[in-house]
Amino acid sequence: MARPLPLNKDLIVCVPSNYSNTSRGKFFENFCADILRRQSYRIDGMEVRKSGMEIDIQATHTPSNEKLYVECKFMQQKVDSSVVDLAFSQAFRLRVKKIALFSISDLGKDAQSTLEDYRLDERIDYSFFDKKEILISIIATGKVEDIPTDDIPAKYTS
């Protein structure tokens, strides 16, 4: 049966309304750390303070022993270029060659351009996980079940 509209999968992360911004951030950091653990990363530290900066997650890929610096942003507004710049500069100062930025929101226009510029720099491997990438990751880990489009009754429309 042909569908008139394509179905888009989305990720909505819900936290209790009484959570403070700090509690929301910690929840999301733990959520991201769990995804990384299921991708063969060992979590070396959470909210690590070094040389005047805070690192949300420090991890090591166990098969390759490569270090990963992770920045987590749990916010509704688009990520701006200052966040992308900050993650790059902190990873560079720490001499970490892999960066992952996790966010439930998209990159703003300037942030997208900034990320593309950094991805051209061969010294650092910079990954961005938006909610679509995060959803793919948690489906791959088996934490949530992916429902095939054909299994969704046709009476549900967007």
Predicted regions and their residues:
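Mixed-charge (Asp/Glu-Lys/Arg
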Residues: 1-158
